[in-house]
Swiss-Prot record:
Keyword Disulfide bond: yes
Example GO BP: protein folding
Originating organism: Rattus norvegicus
Position of sequence motif Prevents secretion from ER: 514-517
Cellular component terms (Gene Ontology): endoplasmic reticulum; endoplasmic reticulum lumen
Catalytic activity: Catalyzes the rearrangement of -S-S- bonds in proteins
Domain of life: Eukaryota
Pfam family, one: Thioredoxin
Annotated protein name in UniProt: Protein disulfide-isomerase A5
Signal peptide residue numbers: 1-21
InterPro entries (UniProt xref): PDI, PDI_a_PDIR, PDI_b_PDIR_N, Thioredoxin-like_sf, Thioredoxin_CS, Thioredoxin_domain
């Protein structure tokens, strides 16, 4: 009997720590067979897999993921693969999991609709992982931004009411939606202001887009995002409406908070008088038929670029319309009122110029100044064909879109990707260097230089998933897995040196394997 107890004690001593000290949810599926993982990815469309160097390395993550699994039950699946286990090693190699660096003990990979989606690189917290699994393509939580540590982040109506009841200091509360572009613009300034006024005023944020916050939206008249409300001792006083403000503007306003001043409505351009003809859905066709040469500016009252161009356009109209020998006229259309015309001419940005010769629409170059308007209207000529875009040029750069991004990268051992916008001046400066780098490695089948135009509609989700916040952004991928953000020199020498270092590492590892044999 004593020997039996001794044997049991011995077994207890060698039991893995996680079995004895970590409560792992039965909702976490442990997998070691590649076929089992393949089957699971085929039948589940939202899977987060924890790959660990060993059982011990996985311990703290398993504790956290056990709670996550319960929170996303029915919406997502969590699996665990112990790469230190002999049976699982083959699976980890097949899934291209590299835990060889000394400081790398675990990896979290997300799979969606049966395919690799991304390496999880957001905050490893209950709230962040749950939010990610409930919306894998959604933006990170605001509180994940290290710069937002001084903003009080509110998650529930209960927490909001508690804050109002207990907070003695003045409170500036931003009600926002995660997808809102205006919110994203002001957030960095809001959080910077929060740091500057810390100890004197509380700045807080709350995502009220979910339907459970309808009561709060109704109570505080949230009709758009963001809506920023000012409170003192829990009592709502008024809204802060300077949504284009900087951190300094917010801090200055908080020194003496005042309600918004009633805005004086702007006089419509058509009512100001002037030399430009203002056309509508009803009279546009007749006007264009009666005038042999018409340049039309489609505009919107709120558009800053339109306001900047308006005096130039008016001055040019005054000159042209006062010249008896000139047959050209300038006209304007408010696209927010005359929606039929805006739709007919596919107006999607402001200002947009359209030119009509004898009633027929013709191409018009980019014109913005009084001088250019006059010169061109005195001698309208078809503009030269636009230069081919980077994507249209014959180069060795792979131009990827959301549909083929993952599959293409998985086929290349080393890929440097440039996320860019065609209008971005920094991008234009880098493009020749990046193109030359791609040409230099065009014969190496394991290397690729790729580019993604983030302005294209079909790429916007992809650029958001890859956390692209500025242009250009460079990411290095190893068989489709994001390894690091490239932040070295943006020159041909910088790019080629980085890639050559990667290839030299490949050769050293190959030589070492040969020596081991």
């Amino acid at each position: 009997m004593a020997r039996a107890w001794g044997l049991l004690l011995a077994i207890g001593v060698i039991l893995p720590t996680w079995l004895s000290s970590t409560k792992v949810s039965s909702l976490i599926e442990r997998i070691s067979d590649p076929k089992d993982l393949k089957k699971l990815l085929r039948t589940r469309n939202n899977v987060l897999v924890l790959y660990s160097e060993s059982e011990v390395a996985a311990e703290s993550h398993l504790k956290l993921l056990s709670t996550v699994a319960q929170a996303v039950k029915g919406q997502g699946t969590i699996c665990w693969v112990d790469c230190g286990d002999a049976e699982s090693r083959k699976l980890c190699k097949k899934m291209k999991v590299d835990l060889s660096p000394k400081d790398k003990k675990i990896e979290l990979f997300h799979y969606q609709d049966g395919a690799f989606h991304m390496q999880y690189d957001r905050a490893v917290t209950l709230k962040s992982i749950v939010a990610f699994l409930k919306d894998p393509k959604g933006p990170p939580l605001w509180e994940e931004d290290p710069g937002a540590k001084d903003v009080v982040h509110i998650d529930s109506e209960k927490d909001f009411r508690r804050l109002l009841k207990k907070e003695e200091k003045p409170l500036l509360m931003m009600f926002y939606a995660p997808w809102c572009s205006m919110c994203k613009r002001i957030m960095p300034h809001f959080q910077k202001a929060a740091t500057q006024v810390r100890g004197h005023t509380v700045l807080a944020g709350m995502n009220v887009y979910p339907p459970e916050f309808e009561n709060i939206k109704e109570e505080y008249n949230v009709r758009g995002y963001p809506t920023i409300c000012y409170f003192e001792k829990g009592r709502f006083l008024f809204q802060y409406e300077n949504y284009g403000s900087t951190a300094e503007d917010i801090v200055e306003w908080l020194k003496n908070p005042q309600p918004p001043q009633p805005q004086v409505p702007e006089t419509p351009w058509a009512d100001e008088g002037g030399s430009v003809y203002h056309l509508t859905d009803e009279d546009f066709d007749q006007f264009v038929k009666e005038h042999s040469s018409v340049l039309v500016m489609f505009h919107a009252p709120w558009c800053g670029h339109c306001k900047k161009m308006k005096p130039e356009f008016e001055s040019a109209a005054e000159v042209l319309h006062g010249d008896a020998e000139s047959s050209g006229v300038l006209a304007a259309v408010d696209a927010t009122i005359n929606e039929a015309l805006a739709e007919r001419f596919h107006i999607s940005a402001f200002p947009t110029l359209k030119y009509f010769k004898n009633g027929e629409q013709q191409a018009v170059p980019a014109l913005r100044t009084k001088k250019k308007f006059i010169e061109w209207m005195q001698n309208p000529e078809a503009p030269p064909p636009p230069e081919p875009t980077w994507e249209e040029q014959q180069t060795s750069v792979l131009h990827l879109v959301g549909d083929n991004f993952r599959e293409t990268l998985k086929k290349k051992k080393h890929t440097l990707v440039m996320f860019y916008a065609p209008w971005c001046p920094h991008c234009k400066k880098v493009i020749p260097h990046f193109t030359a780098t791609a040409d230099a490695f065009k014969d190496d089948r394991k290397i690729a230089c790729a580019a993604v135009d983030c302005v294209k509609d079909k790429n916007q989700d992809l650029c958001q998933q890859e956390s692209v916040k500025a242009y250009p952004t460079f990411h290095y991928y190893h068989y489709g897995k994001l390894v690091e953000k490239y932040e070295s020199d943006r020159t041909e020498l910088g790019f080629t040196s980085f890639i050559r270092t990667l290839r030299e590492g490949d050769l050293k590892r190959l030589e070492k394997r040969r020596e081991d044999l």
